């Protein structure tokens, strides 16, 4: 399965690519912006998007929810340092396709969150 990396931090992308490519059956693809993300999801929406919302060009939770409705088979792992409690509450209450993981999480938790998103249908 291809994991889409929507994170503008080079070091985070490099680290996630390294971790994911060590996991069996997974590969990564970096998407630069929302347009590229939507093109990749049109090709195959049954995928996981690891998204740093705070650094990506998605404007608000409403826009992210529209993407979730447009691509209902996509699993979203919000991977960030700074998400407001209200933002997280809105997303989690709106769809079970969203997961949240802090960038400061230990490696075992990061791997577990990725595997959870991949295995969830």
Each predicted region: which residue ranges?
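Conserved acidic segment of CheY-like receiver
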Residues: 1-11, 16, 20, 49
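Conserved active-site segment of CheY-like receiver
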Residues: 8, 79-83, 103-105
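Short hydrophobic/Thr-rich beta-strand motif most characteristic of the beta2 strand and flanking loop
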Residues: 25-33
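Acidic, metal-coordinating helix/loop segments flanking the phosphotransfer/catalytic sites
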Residues: 32-48
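Conserved phosphotransfer microenvironments
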Residues: 48-67, 80-84
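C-terminal output helix
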Residues: 87, 105-114
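As written
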Residues: 92-98
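The C-terminal output helix
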Residues: 115-121
């Amino acid at each position: 399965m291809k994991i889409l990396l929507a994170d503008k931090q080079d070091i985070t992308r490099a680290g996630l690519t390294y971790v994911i490519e060590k996991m069996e059956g997974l590969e990564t693809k970096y998407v630069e912006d929302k347009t590229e993300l939507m093109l990749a999801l049109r090709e195959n929406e049954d995928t996981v998007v690891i998204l740093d919302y705070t650094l990506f060009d998605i404007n608000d939770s409403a826009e992210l929810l529209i993407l979730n409705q447009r691509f209902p088979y996509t699993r979203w792992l919000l991977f960030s340092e700074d998400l407001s409690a209200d933002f997280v509450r809105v997303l989690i209450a709106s769809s079970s396709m969203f997961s949240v993981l802090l960038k400061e999480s230990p490696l075992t938790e990061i791997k577990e969150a990725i595997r959870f998103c991949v295995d969830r249908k």
